[in-house]
Amino acid sequence: MSRELTPQETAERSLIKTYRKSIWNPFIAAVKRYELIEPGDRIAVCISGGKDSVILAKLMQELQRHTSQPFELVFMVMDPGYKPENRKLIEDNATLLGIPITIFDSDIFDVTISVEKNPCYLCARMRRGFLYAKAQELGCNKIALGHHFSDVIETTVMGLFYGGQLQAMPPKLRSKNFPGMELIRPLYCVHEDAIIAWKNYNHLQFLQCACRFTEEREAAGDGVGRSKRQEIKMLLRELKKTNPNIEKSIFQGINGLQLDTFPGFKHRGVFHSFPELYNHPDWFAGETKSEEISEEL
């Protein structure tokens, strides 16, 4: 008679077995496609206590166990001012799932609570800075964040609708303020629905968002709140009812931009106008596929 698996073993096995197609394979695809991990890397996996960062930690552990490519992992938790019960939940989940976390404190919530305009943006920027600094202190050259496929889509649509910009979320980027540091997003191709399914399958409870602005959403567990991002999330859910592939289409779109069809674009902060490009001898070579499609419509 085989012994009963521990919660940690069940969670790990389900990533490789039950959710291999929807979680493990897309995770590996992103790591390979975007060259996120290199031999000799020392990566700080940043854990907020939510489902996304925790599943990222488990996936990175599994990858480290099953790859011949040597790299090191550090599991880092920044406490920006959590309530004691929220911090305890993070610690309990780390113990339950076998994640050896390092916790450090900051006063980010105290700073941002008094900010009326864009507190979430300020909080995110401050968090990023603290995480880079601590990771560098721990000898890491990369930080890994839990942004997933759905975040990429929502960010793109939100920027277009509310920011007046067609801008995506890159799978990795170099830090401007911390030389030698990079940020990677290994969940780039993993859908949020799959992460929620894994969480429910393993009967796990995570922080929804422990921010003081959004604590009322903790018990819901559906990822829906009151921010502009949540408005976009709900809009996409509605659109998926009539077009199930809408997120896939958006993702393919940002992976295959045809710049010669745009009236202008920015590259490394420099704006390039349509006349500038139109008159460039190597840029325009005639009608584009999008023009043909437009004429058909």
Task: Locate each region found by the language model.
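Electropositive phosphate-/nucleotide-binding environments in soluble metabolic enzymes
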Residues: K17, K21, P84, R125, ...
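ATP-dependent adenylation/nucleotidyltransferase module used to activate substrates
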Residues: S2-M158, Y162-L166, P170, R174, ...
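Catalytic subdomain that performs nucleotidyl-dependent activation
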Residues: L73, S150-L235
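The feature marks non-catalytic terminal segments
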Residues: L204-L297
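Short, basic, helix/turn surface patches
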Residues: M126-L138, K172-F178, K233-G253
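Long, contiguous hydrophobic alpha-helical segments, chiefly transmembrane helices and signal peptides
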Residues: F27, L187, F251-I254
